[in-house]
């Protein structure tokens, strides 16, 4: 982003003197009174656990969540979202540059099972995969052995699609509950994976099948919610203990205002479904925070699918991506207001399933 684009956004340093940035300020256009005098620009300030300015690297972002995602090895359900307006960088945050994440077919990243390209633009998903395999390997000395499997799906117009299925596959994907009440999806492919390279191949396959379209806000916009799931089943051959963790890494479709985008036909329907599901996500988080007797998980496929990971037994983190463009200032403010509400919610204390003899904590 250029300096002119960022002129309406400031990142004040935390006042406690540690140099961290935990606030963001946005400035609207100069307000003119009825007499023609300037009233100054309207200011909006929001406080969060952490704010990343434009110069922050992908590694800076991942370091903030690295302990959180690793706790899946400890038997926790972990959920990481990227939320924001279309074109604000959610997919870059979660995946990085498409070719940098997985390489093209036959590239060195595909042939080397332990390799992630070293250009620094890899996102949360490939960095998480690398860390999980490295950490699980280091736990072998303590007797732990892990079986990892991955799935990748998208929710498009309230319909679930398996991004790892062969093109043309015509199966119905229903959300179901097992005897213990845990959520699963029928017919979804789970690939057992033994190294990062295998996961990167799956990511590349999924990216080619995801629903993309040009919009007025973004020439290459994701029109679906994508959900990458990594299932981690561990067993300690010395103690007999077991651990079952799940990682949900989610790139939410971009929110848009119909009046501003002027969508018609299929694009209009897509936007309506996207906005409704994002609204349902906010409703669920609010209900959890208010300790409501009824949590409206089933109001959308997204919240229904993530019921296990949104509830109080999970660890959940949301990235909010903000566009630097002046014309999207109002949408950015709306995103930050939603994020502030989410940040104020306490949905309970996470509980793990199983027992691993090391501890991690979320930030």
What do these predicted ranges mean?
Residues 1-2:
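Short polar catalytic/cofactor-binding loops
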Residues 11-20, 341-343, 347:
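Short, cationic low-complexity segments
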Residues 15-309, 313, 332:
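P-loop NTPase motor catalytic core
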Residues 29, 321-322:
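Short, loop-centered acidic/histidine patches that primarily coordinate divalent metals
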Residues 181-194, 198, 202, 312-316, ...:
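Conserved GTP-binding G-domain of TRAFAC-class P-loop NTPases and closely related GTPase folds
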